[in-house]
């Protein structure tokens, strides 16, 4: 078994080793690229303060770029007996460069390394989420504009209520995604601050230049207080998880609507046959499994903030191994949410709308408010008009006028999709992805 970075003259018990390492070797593969990027920035800073010579820096950077290329191609592995990605990278450097590889850890702890890795990983995955949310948003706005004239029943308490439209339905979920990205942007601001240099949570006696690594990695700012930088472990993940839960909540609700509207009892929308699954016993079945799985996966993601909260709950300041378990629920959640966004976008692009829903007389009563409003406009007090129409309904004499005349902002006749699109564009511009991408590219390419 390879010696741990921290082992001295006593080898750790095998069962203790297996238990404490847990799933780190598997999950740290997600962090490999970012661990290398962090090391590039750190050693560049070490050279600037005299802890590495220029020729040593050049040799280390060249080797780290080779390791980065392996990770980028998915060929990086964490060997048996190696605890984590940090240990594996240092081991690879030491094998290739001897004692020079042992110098990269000066002024650094695995505590601030993993903080940094998680932040670099998370901000890149946030960028992917933003792109996928924008893709779904574009489809929803397009469908809203395409079907803006097609009416469907609106419901309260699952009872037929008032006229709605597919323009409103698609557009509502588009605007919901705008607010979801606003929350994600707030989480991104917390994520995009540099913890490197906080070491084990109490700083270092080396004259580290933390602003330099902040600039090299394209962070917006620092986690200044070194104790708080360590306290941010769990807090950052929980904040991002709340934002992910917001997106998941939108997807879950949309998936429920789609399942319900696709059922034979509603028949508002239809999925292409190739987008449905069948039954082993009922030959007529065409099941909306994609939406059902999206609903379940999204509901699972909505529980993510609570999972992280319970792992961190009642921990004092400082580092504790409890925090390791956050990775097990946090890292895979990005894959699940991204999969849901891709599939819902794919489904919503191809959904077929029933343009003759209101030919069915069962929906006649949803025009009752329209009739009340017409009488109010003719001069009858609202409460009297309400009573007149109510009595006509009870007597079976109500005859609906199925023409609707809604003109105010955000209504059937004035969807404000251009304004909603403008809001989405403004939110996306508020992310500092350009600086992040440029900084990482510069480190990789030299």
Residue ranges and their predicted role:
Residues 217-305:
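Acidic, glycine-rich loop-and-beta core segments that form the ion-binding/anion-interacting portion
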Residues 141, 145-148, 189-192, 259, ...:
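Alpha-helical coiled-coil oligomerization motifs
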């Amino acid at each position: 078994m390879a010696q741990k970075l921290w082992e001295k003259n006593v080898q750790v018990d095998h069962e203790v080793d297996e238990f404490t390492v847990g799933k780190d070797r598997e999950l740290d593969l997600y962090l490999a690229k970012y661990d290398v990027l962090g090391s590039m920035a750190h050693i560049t800073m070490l050279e600037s303060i005299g802890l590495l010579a220029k020729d040593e820096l050049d040799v280390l950077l060249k080797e780290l770029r080779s390791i980065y290329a392996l990770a980028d191609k998915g060929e990086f592995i964490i060997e048996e007996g190696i605890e984590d990605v940090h240990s594996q990278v240092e081991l690879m450097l030491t094998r290739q460069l001897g004692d020079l590889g042992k110098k990269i850890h000066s002024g650094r702890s695995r505590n601030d390394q993993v903080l940094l890795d998680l932040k670099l990983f998370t901000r890149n995955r946030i960028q992917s989420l933003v792109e996928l949310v924008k893709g779904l948003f574009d489809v929803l706005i397009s469908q809203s504009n395409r079907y803006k004239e097609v009416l469907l029943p609106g419901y309260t308490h699952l009872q037929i209520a008032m006229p709605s439209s597919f323009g409103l339905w698609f557009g509502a979920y588009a605007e919901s995604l705008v607010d979801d990205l606003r929350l994600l942007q707030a989480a991104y601001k917390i994520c995009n601050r540099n913890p490197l240099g906080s070491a084990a949570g109490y700083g270092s006696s080396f004259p580290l230049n933390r602003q330099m690594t902040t600039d090299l990695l394209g962070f917006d700012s620092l986690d200044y207080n070194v104790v708080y930088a360590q306290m941010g472990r769990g807090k950052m993940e929980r904040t991002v998880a709340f934002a992910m839960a917001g997106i998941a909540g939108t997807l879950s609700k949309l998936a429920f609507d789609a399942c319900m509207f696709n059922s034979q009892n509603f028949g508002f929308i239809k999925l292409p046959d190739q987008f449905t699954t069948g039954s082993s016993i009922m030959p007529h079945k065409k099941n909306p499994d994609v939406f059902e799985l999206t609903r379940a996966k999204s509901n699972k993601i909505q529980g993510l903030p609570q999972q992280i909260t319970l792992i961190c709950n009642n921990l004092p300041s400082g580092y504790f191994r409890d925090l390791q378990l956050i990775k097990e629920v946090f890292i895979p959640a990005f894959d699940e949410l991204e999969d849901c966004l891709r599939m819902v976008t794919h489904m919503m692009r191809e959904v077929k709308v029933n343009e003759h829903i209101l030919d069915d007389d069962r929906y006649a009563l949803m025009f009752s408010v329209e009739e009340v409003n017409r009488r109010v406009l003719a001069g009858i007090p609202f409460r009297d008009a309400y009573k007149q129409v109510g009595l006509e309904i009870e007597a079976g004499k109500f005859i609906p006028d199925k023409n609707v005349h809604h003109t105010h902002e955000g209504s059937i006749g004035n969807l404000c999709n251009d304004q909603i699109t403008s809001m989405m564009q403004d939110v996306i511009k508020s992310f500092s992805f350009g600086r992040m991408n440029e900084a990482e590219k510069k480190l990789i390419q030299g």
